[in-house]
C-alpha cells in the first residue's frame, strides 16, 4: 500500500514540475483523407500484411504523407504492396500503424473525411465526425524497404483494370 501511495505522490509531483507542451509542438504528421478511399486501400493492403512474424513492423501498414498524397505500404517479406491516395497534408511525416486495428477503425468510422494526427511519440489520433480513436504506432524507420526492381520493364495501369484482369 505504501509503495502505491508513494508512486502516486511521485507521479503527481512530476506532473506539477513538468512543463506542458503546446499541442502544435507535438505534431509530427497530420493529414485528412476521404474515408472511402482510405478504407479501400487499407482493405487491399491487408493481403500483404504478415500475421505471424518476429518483426512487429510487418504486422503494420507504413503510412507516409508528402505533398498532396498518402503512400501506404504493406510487406510480408514475400509480397509487397504500395498504393497512393490524394490527401490534404498539413504536416508531412510517416508512421507504422497495426494493420488489423487500423483497418477496423477506418471501417467503423462515419462516412466522413478522416483526419490523422501523429505526435512525436508515434501516438496517432484518428478523427472522423464525432468519432475519435487514439492508437500507438511504430517508428517508420522500423519498416523494411521494399526491394527495387531494376532490370525489368514496368508498366502503369489503373487499379480497376488490373483487378478485372486477375479475376
Regions found by a protein language model. Give the residues of each.
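Structural preference for solvent-exposed beta-strand-turn elements
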Residues: 3-167
Amino acid at each position: 500500500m505504501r509503495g502505491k501511495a508513494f508512486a502516486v505522490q511521485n507521479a503527481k509531483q512530476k506532473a506539477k514540475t513538468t512543463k506542458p507542451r503546446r499541442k502544435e509542438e507535438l505534431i509530427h504528421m497530420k493529414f485528412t483523407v476521404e474515408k472511402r478511399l482510405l478504407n479501400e486501400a487499407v482493405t487491399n493492403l491487408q493481403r500483404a500484411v504478415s500475421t505471424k512474424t518476429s518483426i512487429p513492423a510487418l504486422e503494420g501498414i507504413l503510412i507516409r504523407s508528402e505533398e498532396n498524397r498518402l503512400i501506404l505500404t504493406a510487406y510480408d517479406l514475400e509480397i509487397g504492396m504500395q498504393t497512393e491516395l490524394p490527401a490534404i497534408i498539413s504536416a508531412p511525416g510517416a508512421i507504422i500503424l497495426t494493420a488489423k486495428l487500423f483497418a477496423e477503425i477506418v471501417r467503423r468510422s462515419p462516412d466522413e473525411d478522416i483526419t490523422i494526427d501523429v505526435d512525436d511519440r508515434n501516438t496517432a489520433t484518428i478523427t472522423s465526425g464525432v468519432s475519435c480513436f487514439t492508437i500507438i504506432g511504430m517508428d517508420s524507420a522500423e519498416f523494411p524497404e521494399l526491394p527495387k526492381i531494376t532490370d525489368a520493364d514496368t508498366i502503369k495501369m489503373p487499379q480497376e483494370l488490373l483487378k478485372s484482369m486477375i479475376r
